[in-house]
Amino acid sequence: MQIFLDTADIEAIEERYDSGIVAGVTTNPTLVANQGINYLELIQEIAEVFPEMESISAEVKGDTAAEMIDDAAKYRDISEAVTIKLPMTKEGIKACKYFSEVGVKTNVTLCFSVAQAALAGMAGATYISPFVGRLNDNSFSGVELVRGIADLYCTQAIETKVLAASLRDVHHVSRCFLYGAKVCTLPITVSYTHLTLPTTLSV
């Protein structure tokens, strides 16, 4: 059971990393670009500032598996912690299979069904990221998807870890861990409330 942070804010990562329970970071290049930050330099900085980080997800660009593999080259030499973030598409799965065969960690993202998670598992993904909050926005239960994927992986002895993403509140976090997620990646707003519950502070 691990906590990742879903942010590009180095100071926010430092503040929470000191707790000793943050094992990784997930990033979104679109949001990073909107902040005027160079994405490659950000990944390099995170790896330098937090050398013991287990996983730093770096999202690649490309419409084909070959393009994704080529784009990933600039991240692979940064650190062994770098995990290549791939889309849940046919080409993304092809790229995932390649990376698993050469020993590169992968995070297959934008997962919205157990069937998709099965494909990622068969391709050897290190992590699968079901988008809990995004599913809830469309009247589906994101935490139930987490449970379904975890059950599938357990039944079939698939080593891919469920990395619950798009978490909106602490209840999402608790239920995802309860239902079998190995990792929850928390936005900064959720990490504040998750790590500092008002009822605890008032005692």
Residue map of PLM features:
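Conserved small/polar residues in nucleotide/adenosyl-binding loops
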Residues: T193-T199
